[in-house]
């Protein structure tokens, strides 16, 4: 069967709208077999979002802290969750081994049930996503300055790790130029004093 294609379907505006809609919708992988309607939806980012992640079995502290956390939260409604966790950790350390023993036994039972339910389970911790480094604005990343040394402009730039080297280099230039400037500034005074003494001798 042939389908009549409208010429407007290939206009630049329609093509741009279709490309944008394709980027927003989840990607669909179709099989090459034309008679099959099977498809696999991968999601917008390509990750397996439909599968539930298997949780680890609770340890003795988690078993004990479930009821204790609820109790502390009811007694102190204004207390933050982080403060509750610190308090529970301190209270757990203060318990004796005999007081902890029932919770270790319960955790062992839960671990056995988890092993029977998920025989091939392996704990894989989630890797923390690397945060992109914040880019400094152009004004702060590259600081250009100009200094006037012996009637000459020397531009220099502070950038990344070269700031210290550039600063020391400019300080060395300054220290080198100071005697010259001092000498040049003293020259008019010497000429003035010699001219004054010469004129005084002529008068006498």
From Swiss-Prot:
GO terms for biological process: cell differentiation; male sex determination; sex differentiation. GO terms for molecular function: calmodulin binding; DNA-binding transcription activator activity, RNA polymerase II-specific; RNA polymerase II cis-regulatory region sequence-specific DNA binding. Residues 174-187, 194-204 have a biased composition (Polar residues). It comes from the Eukaryota. It is found in: Nucleus speckle; Cytoplasm; Nucleus. Keywords: Acetylation, Activator, Calmodulin-binding, Cytoplasm, Differentiation, DNA-binding, Nucleus, Repressor, Sexual differentiation, Transcription, Transcription regulation. GO terms for cellular component: cytoplasm; nuclear speck; nucleus. PROSITE patterns: HMG_BOX_2. Transmembrane segments: none annotated. SMART domains: HMG. The keyword Amino-acid biosynthesis does not apply. Residues 54-122 bind DNA. Acetylation of Lys-130 contributes to its nuclear localization and enhances its interaction with KPNB1. Deacetylated by HDAC3. Residues 30-52, 171-204 are annotated as: Disordered. Belongs to the SRY family. Transcriptional regulator that controls a genetic switch in male development. It is necessary and sufficient for initiating male sex determination by directing the development of supporting cell precursors (pre-Sertoli cells) as Sertoli rather than granulosa cells. Involved in different aspects of gene regulation including promoter activation or repression. Binds to the DNA consensus sequence 5'-[AT]AACAA[AT]-3'. SRY HMG box recognizes DNA by partial intercalation in the minor groove and promotes DNA bending. Also involved in pre-mRNA splicing. Interacts with CALM, EP300, HDAC3, KPNB1, ZNF208 isoform KRAB-O, PARP1, SLC9A3R2 and WT1. The interaction with EP300 modulates its DNA-binding activity. The interaction with KPNB1 is sensitive to dissociation by Ran in the GTP-bound form. Interaction with PARP1 impaired its DNA-binding activity. This is Sex-determining region Y protein.
